[in-house]
């Protein structure tokens, strides 16, 4: 891939070049519960096998979602963060998240990642993805 990464079936990306990288992400969370909950997001990397990922120290960001506004209107948060990290060629990185109260859209109450198809009414706008992100090469490792 021309981007310097190969996307993997397990939602990780494998670096083609050793270096220092910056991941930037935006995650759309919803809370349909009557209580405040946290969404906790962090990076995991591996040593060339995407089957055993290790947590990246100091990569965690906590997003607090207030209680829902009403039974039909969840509380939304667009969580944004940037993390600088090191990868060797052949290593993979993935973005992970967890919460104290997981839910599904239209299912149990709690936190879930929110996506919305393109809309035409009452006004037209494109789809709202649950996650956006990019990985940027910052520099080679110091010699």
Can you name each region flagged by the protein language model?
Residues 1-143:
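Extracellular jelly-roll beta-sandwich "head" domains, especially the C-terminal globular C1q domain
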């Amino acid at each position: 891939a021309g981007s310097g990464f190969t996307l993997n079936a397990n939602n990780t990306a494998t670096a083609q070049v050793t270096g220092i990288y910056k991941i930037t992400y935006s995650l759309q969370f919803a809370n349909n519960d009557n209580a405040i909950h946290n969404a906790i997001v962090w990076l995991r990397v591996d040593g060339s096998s995407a089957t055993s990922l290790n947590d990246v120290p100091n990569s965690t960001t906590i997003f607090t979602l207030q209680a829902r506004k009403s039974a039909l209107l969840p509380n939304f948060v667009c969580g944004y963060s940037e993390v600088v990290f090191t990868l060797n060629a052949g290593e993979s990185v993935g973005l992970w998240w967890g919460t104290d109260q997981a839910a599904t859209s239209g299912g149990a109450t709690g936190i879930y990642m929110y996506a919305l198809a393109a809309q035409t009414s009452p006004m037209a706008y494109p789809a709202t993805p649950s996650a956006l992100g990019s990985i940027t090469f910052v520099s080679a490792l110091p010699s």
